[in-house]
C-alpha cells in the first residue's frame, strides 16, 4: 500500500514538472521557438485545430518563425488565430507562408515575463505541495489497516523527500528560464 502511494506521488509530481516545462516553453523569451505557438488553435473546416497540425513551423533565423501550411486555404485562419492570441505578434502573410518576427524585448517586458515565470513556478510548487498533502492523508488513513506508526512515519518522510526534490527542480527550472529571458 505504501509503495503504491509513493509511486502515485512520484507520477503526479513528475507530471507537474512536465506541465511546468511545457508552459514555460510557450512563453516568449525574445527568440523564436515553435513551442510559442503550441497553445494557439485556428478554426479550420469548422473545428479548432492546433497550428502545428495545420502546417510546418520552422525557425529560419533566431527571431523569425515561419509557418508553411499544408493547405493554402488555412493561411487566413492561421493569421487570425495568431492575431487573436496573447502573444502580441503581427503575422506577415505572403500568400504561401506566414512569417512571425519576434520583436526585441524591452527591459519592462522582460521584467513582466519574469514575473509571470515566477508566478507559474509558484503555482507548480503549490501543486506539488497539494500532492504531498493528499499522499500524507492517504498514508494516515493506513492506520486503520493496522500499518505500524514507524512505517507511516517513514512513508511521510519519503513523501517529504520527494516533495523537496521536486521543489528544488522547479526552482532550478525557473531560475534557468529567468536567466534566458534576462540575458537576451
From Swiss-Prot:
Listed GO biological process terms: translation; translational termination
Key word Protein biosynthesis present: yes
Major subcellular location class: cytoplasm
One Pfam family this sequence matches: RRF
InterPro entries: Ribosome_recyc_fac (IPR002661), Ribosome_recyc_fac_dom (IPR023584), RRF_sf (IPR036191)
A cellular component annotation (GO) from this entry: cytoplasm
Function of the protein: Responsible for the release of ribosomes from messenger RNA at the termination of protein biosynthesis. May increase the efficiency of translation by recycling ribosomes from one round of translation to another.
HAMAP family the record matches: RRF
Name the record gives this protein: Ribosome-recycling factor
Name of the gene encoding the protein in the UniProt record: frr
